C-alpha cells in the first residue's frame, strides 16, 4: 500500500518521461516522420518533406490548437462553456458565406499609405430641377406698384374712427369754402363721440343711484355726538 501511495504522489515527468500531450505541443521533440503523418491526416500538402524547419512551421500553423483561457468554475464559466460550440459553428458559417461571395473583402495591408486628394463634385445649379412647392411666391412675381397689405382688426377700427373725425377735404389744390363749416363738423363729431361715451354707462347709472338712496347706506352713516 505504501509503495502504491508513493507511486501516486510521484510526478509523471520527474523521471524524464514526457506525456503525449507535451510531445504534441512541442514539435521539435517529434520525429520528422510523425510530423509528416500528422500533416497528411490534415490534408496539408508538403512541398519539401526533407526540410525540418518547413515541417515544423506547418505543424505549428495547422496542427497545434490555439490557446484558450481557462474559464472559472462559476455560473458565468458554465454559461460560456455552453456558448463556445455555438460561437465555433457561427464562425464556420461566416467563413463559408465569405467564401461564397462574388467579390472578395477589401483588406488594408498598409502598403499604400499615400492617398490622393479627394475631389468633390459640385452640384450644377443649371441642371437642378425647379421646385414648385413654395410657401411664398418669389420676389420677382410680386408687383411693387400695387402691394397688398393686410391690416389687423384693431388697426382698421382706428383708421375708421380717424376717418370719421377728419373733415371732408376736396381734391388736391382746393380751398375749403368757409371756416364755419369746419367748426360745425368738428362740433358735430365731438357731440357724437360724447353721446357714445354717455350711452355705455347709462345702464349702470340707476343701480348706483339706488345704492345711494337705499336705507342701508343711511343706517351705516352715523353722526358723532359729543357729550
Swiss-Prot record:
Key word Ubl conjugation present in the record? no
Membrane-spanning residues:
none
Q: Does the keyword Nucleus apply?
A: yes
Q: Where is the composition biased (Basic and acidic residues)?
A: 71-84, 204-219
Q: Where is this region: Disordered?
A: 71-227
Q: Could you state one GO cellular component term attached to this entry?
A: tRNA-splicing ligase complex
Q: Where in the cell is it found?
A: Nucleus
Signal peptide per UniProt: none
Q: Name one GO biological process term.
A: embryonic morphogenesis
Residue ranges, compositional bias (Low complexity): 88-98, 178-191
Composition bias (Polar residues) maps to: 153-173
Task: Give the record's keywords alphabetically.
Answer: Nucleus
Record-linked PANTHER family: ASHWIN
| Family assignment from sequence similarity | Belongs to the ashwin family.
Question: Which protein, by its recorded name, is this?
Answer: Ashwin
